């Protein structure tokens, strides 16, 4: 039987942020389950980051290097830093069964807009201390 593929969209799991620590803890446990293949779409790092080599699961760096032609698009799009521009490319490459995210709604809402949304299960845990609370709360009522 084929392994279930899980993509975690997040701040790179080796950074020193709350989201990164949470992600590292979750992915390190999921990685140990033989039935799963896990990867992360790692925000705020580019392909030259040395930590990618030592990460035991797949890593798709979100940030282009300055020499890439996509760098100007990345710098010109405020939500590109959260994965907006690279998400669909990663979906096509990794083809996850499940996409997970634990950030603020405005950091992950592009995942709902993806043209590939019907092809993955979406497990999100948006924080509730963020703005805009009224709009976010309506999503779950």
Model-derived segments and spans:
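N-terminal subdomain of nucleotide-sugar transferases
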Residues: 1-49, 53, 94
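Extended catalytic core of nucleotide-activated donor transferases of GT-like folds
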Residues: 54-141
């Amino acid at each position: 039987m084929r392994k279930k593929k899980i993509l975690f969209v997040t701040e790179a799991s080796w950074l020193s942020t709350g989201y990164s620590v949470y992600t590292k803890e979750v992915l390190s446990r999921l990685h140990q389950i033989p039935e799963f293949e896990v990867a992360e779409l790692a925000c705020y790092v580019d392909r030259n980051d040395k930590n990618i080599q030592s990460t035991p699961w797949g890593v798709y760096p979100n940030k282009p290097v300055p020499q890439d032609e996509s760098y100007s698009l990345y710098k010109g799009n405020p939500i590109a830093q959260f994965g907006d521009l690279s998400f669909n490319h990663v979906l096509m490459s990794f083809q996850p069964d499940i996409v997970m995210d634990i950030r603020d709604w405005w950091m992950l809402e592009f995942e709902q807009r993806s043209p590939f949304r019907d092809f993955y299960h979406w497990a999100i845990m948006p924080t509730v201390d963020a703005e805009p609370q009224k709009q976010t709360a309506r999503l779950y009522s």
